[in-house]
Amino acid sequence: MELKVIDKKDDFLVCEVENDATLGSRKSVNVPGVRINLPSLTEKDRKNILWAIENDLDFIAHSFVRNKQDVMDIQRILDEHNSPIKIIAKIENQEGVDNIDEILEVAYGIMLSLIHI
């Protein structure tokens, strides 16, 4: 689905749909070239990390990593629980690409999503 912004308000955008598509629930939104100022982790993410710790997973792949802090937010939770889980940073936007060197300093590995970049 592709949208064209036709008006911008303080807390929402008015968009025109450019093609035929159906938007389902629980879908992410990719806005190329725009920095999205949202927290790296949701409450659901935190619960999923705790589940991963309890179930001795080896890796966590964190989507839409933008910077080093996004990885460190997960690492802090893992450290609080003395977990050896490794973090794979999924780079899916330009901000992540721009900060890839600092992300590599703290992540075990990276995955690049060529569809989103």
Go through each PLM region and give its residues.
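Active-site beta-loop-alpha junctions enriched in small/polar residues
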Residues: 18-20, 65, 90-94
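Short beta-strand/loop segments at the ligand-binding rim of alpha/beta enzyme cores
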Residues: 31-36, 78-90
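Conserved, mostly hydrophobic/aromatic
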Residues: 52, 60, 103, 113
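Hydrophobic faces of well-ordered beta-strands that scaffold small-molecule active sites
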Residues: 60, 87-91, 110-112
